[in-house]
Amino acid sequence: MVAGRSRARSPGSWLFPGLWLLAVGGPGSLLQAQEQPSCKKAFDLYFVLDKSGSVANNWIEIYNFVHQLTERFVSPEMRLSFIVFSSQATIILPLTGDRYKIGKGLEDLKAVKPVGETYIHEGLKLANEQIQNAGGLKASSIIIALTDGKLDGLVPSYAENEAKKSRSLGASVYCVGVLDFEQAQLERIADSKDQVFPVKGGFQALKGIINSILAQSCTEILELSPSSVCVGEKFQVVLTGRAVTSISHDGSVLCTFTANSTYTKSEKPVSIQPSSILCPAPVLNKDGETLEVSISYNDGKSAVSRSLTITATECTNGIAAIVAILVLLLLLGAALMWWFWPLCCKVVIKDPPPPPSAPMEEEEEDPLPNKKWPTVDASYYGGRGVGGIKRMEVRWGDKGSTEEGARLEKAKNAVVMVPEEEIPIPSRPPRPRPTHQAPQTKWYTPIKGRLDALWALIMKQYDRVSLMRPQEGDEGRCINFSRVPHQ
């Protein structure tokens, strides 16, 4: 019996496996799983495990390998199945997405007692039966078959036939060989030699190939470009993701386009790179038309990714924008020509400006009063005695008398009288202190100052050009340049 995908899960169904994982792996197991690479794609993953007598002493290593690899596939839509084979094959865990059942299946897998032969084809047969009953192409199917030792007799041939049937059902087959296996046998069972993972270091080295299996098997398409196209335009799409080349080994990759959920067309890719696929796309003829893009392999039997959507939009013609830009440039050129052409074509002749008038010199008033000069009785000058000369007093320094008195000869008995009192010099009153307060500096004051300086510079240059322009009534002539031969 095959269990289907669970649609509703109670909170308890998630709690038990979480506590079980914590108990098995320790407190750091959940944190370590978060730090390691994981796969978020939805898979139907089938583990086909060898439980023959040759692995009896190493079964716990096989169990740990399955347990750790299961933790890396973190999609809530992932479904798992555990199948063991020896002389016969047994389904330990039917295909299910119920996390509670998966936890219970891991416990049952741990309790398996290995014994018997290595009939790997029996395990592949049970996987194919579940794939047929799993619900078509809703999810990709992956088979990971693990065995040790050489396959004897007709077992390799039977296993190859079952693997071909798996691929016809849309599944990918990966093989893990431990110790004394034969590489060529597993390469014929797997999809390609790149999908065979040898573990020659023994069962303890199984955990070392988990990342390699994850990188090969987790094929995801994460991004589509372009997301919108112009109506009626031919284009190609680029789908980027990881592990893209792992599905292109047989050239069966197809790009499927579905227009408006009605018309479907498949195209082979133009090129396949390690992280991208380039596909030709059909033309969209209506505004708002949608195109769903998906990738599949095995001739469309195995879906790689969910559909990504492209939308058609009306695109304006770029010629109109170019014409508008050219018109604006022409208008700007005409305006510049109107402004600068008079400067190039006229020499303005103007009268020189009159010389500036000499500034009027103002006599400085002496705020200090004139000093009193001594008076001299000049009656003794010149006559050398009394008689014939009237008495005359000369005030030195008054109305030119200083120079006149300097020519006189002072008599022997001339009397010089000096006034005792002098007029005091008045002191200037102190200047009053300014009453206005300094303006407060705002946060934008430095910015405003720089902008004002820039604007002043622009206006200064504008005024310089404006002054050079001829005004009404100015006369001149065009400047003509001609080459004069050297004499």
From Swiss-Prot:
UniProt family annotation: Belongs to the ATR family.
Oligomer status and interactors: Binds laminin, and possibly also collagen type IV.
Cellular localization per UniProt: Membrane
Organism: Mus musculus (Mouse)
Positions bound to a divalent metal cation: 52, 54, 118
Listed SMART domains: VWA
Lineage: Eukaryota, Metazoa, Chordata, Craniata, Vertebrata
Name of the protein described by the UniProt record: Anthrax toxin receptor 2
Topology of the protein relative to the lipid bilayer: Single-pass type I membrane protein
